[in-house]
Amino acid sequence: MNIEFLKSIVENKFAVPDNYEVAELTLKLIENLGAVEWELRDYSYMTLSAWIWGWYDRTNYSDAEMLELAEKAKCNIKIGLGEAENDGVFLRSYSILLLSDLTDFHRYHPYLGETEIRDRMELYLTYIKREQDLRGMFLQRKDGHTELLMLLML
């Protein structure tokens, strides 16, 4: 999956391309959240968000699939948490964005139990407490978004 492919999805109002399944694309989109290339991260996150919220139609995920997405995001957030000055911040920060979308979606379409909501809140607080990579900008790379994310989670 390259930037041009992702741009074509965005330009087509986030329609799933012919001959592709949401499930197979989702796995690659999640992997792209940790990409060093900012466009690959941004377009991948935008596509996942659009498919969660159903910007132009309806959500592309069932409740069970959204829970699976959340589990992947939660695992990604923990990878390298507490380390500083490495590219793992991309995966963590974009996974926080994804988890935030999945959690916020619950307000409009309840699908989470109380335990899951509490677990996510605990993870957000752990992230705020342990994230060490607080760079606002990377040389030659788009920002890691860490400080902004911490404010949004509060």
Feature-to-residue mapping (PLM):
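N-terminal alpha-helical scaffold/docking segments in eukaryotic complex subunits
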Residues: 1-62
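A Lys/Arg-rich helix-loop hairpin that forms a DNA/phosphate-binding surface
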Residues: 60-70
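Eukaryote-skewed repeat-based solenoidal scaffolds used as protein-protein interaction platforms
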Residues: 68-78, 82-154
